[in-house]
Every structure is written in C-alpha cells, then in structure tokens.
Amino acid sequence: MALCLANSLVACHGFNAYDQLVRYKWWYKFGYMSATGRCFDIGTGTRQSLLEFERRQNIFAKKFNTPFTDMDRLSDSELLQKFDVYCSDHGVAGNGALTGLAPVPLFFYREPPVAVEYSGVSGQITHGDTTAYDACRYYGALIVAALQGYEKEQLLDDNFYQKHKEWFSIKRLHHEIESISRGSYKKSGYDAGIRGKGYIVNALEAALWAFWSDDNSFEKGALAAVNLGDDTDTTAAIYGQLAGA
C-alpha cells in the first residue's frame, strides 16, 4: 500500500484520495505493486473499505451516467468533489492505517501543516476512527521533523506535540494519542504492557517504544518490534518508517 500511495502522489503531482483508493483496489484485486503479483495479508478494515469504495463507484457511475469501466480513471474535478472517499465505518482503528504512511510526509515535508493533515486523511479513508486519523497525524509529524533534520532526542521529546501545535491546526489530538506524545511508551517493554497489537494505539506505542529503546541501531529496534509478538510485521513496518527517516 505504501508503494500504491507513493505512486499516486507522483502520478497526480499531489494528494488525491480517490486515486489512492483506486490503486489500493488494484492491489487488492489484481496484485498491483505487489512483489509477488498478488495481494496478501490485507487487514479486515482495509478490505471492507475497498469493497465499500467499489460499491460507491457502482452507485456513482449509475447516478452520473458514467460507464463503470471508466470510474478508475475518473479525473473530472467537479465529479471527484462529489465522491465521498471516506469509505470506512466509524470506529475502525486498525494498525493498517499507519503501515504505509511514509510517502505522505516524504512528499510534503517542506510544508509541515499540509503533511500532517494529509497524513491523517491518508489513514482515515480506510480506517474511519478518530484515533486512526490522529495516530497518522502525529506519526506523520515525527517523520516530517526527522526529514527536516531533528535529532532523535527532539523527536522523542515529551513536549514535541505542544511545541509543534501549529502543525496540527486547531484539531487537538485524541487523548490516547496525546498520551503517547507525552511519552507513555517510555517503559520496560513487553513486561510493562507494550504490545504490537492490531489496535492502532497499541501499534503506535509499540513502534515508538522500539525506536526509543533501540540504542540507535535499526537492527536492534526492528528485532525488538518483532519480538513484541502479535502483529509483528506491522509493528516493524511502522517502526521502520521513522527509524529509517
């Protein structure tokens, strides 16, 4: 999905949520951008959102007398504005929203408020809960800061969010994400309750714990993320986006 997102940003010369969903659908149905030529290990929330997206395409095509076969290439700006791209049910807060986030802050890092907002939207179109939106906004902000040359200690500052509130506009972070921003992950790891679970709050906390405790070793951090168990590959993928920046 990260490759689909990156491809969309480049092809569209910017953020186009509809085009992103089209490419995610191609991945799901045809293996687009997959190393194996097929989709594998898609999360429940993502799958349901893509099925809903295709259902809405069908309805939209009939309403506006557009051949369904043309819907994936829809480019009319007025029609695109009428299409509701938020295809997730409310309350969906899986870790998949964070897994492929990095292309957004990479593309927009020179404009932090834009990067942060689009980071949130990129997750919310498939994972509709506020926690998913805010987890993506916060993590996107950290990646932006890393790309702008911030030191690790600055990224892990318990007051990072407070010091960069202008990046988040007037939308305050969800209280669970704000707790993470204040360092809730800074504890002894698995024995202290850190888990790489499917809930996005747990996943974000686990990835940041691995980053905080990796002694500046990517290998150590990735192994620590995996060794937390549960959804190991996703935790490591989230960790790697920030650690690799």
Stretches with model-predicted labels:
Residues 1-245:
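Structured, active/binding-site neighborhoods that engage oxygen-rich ligands
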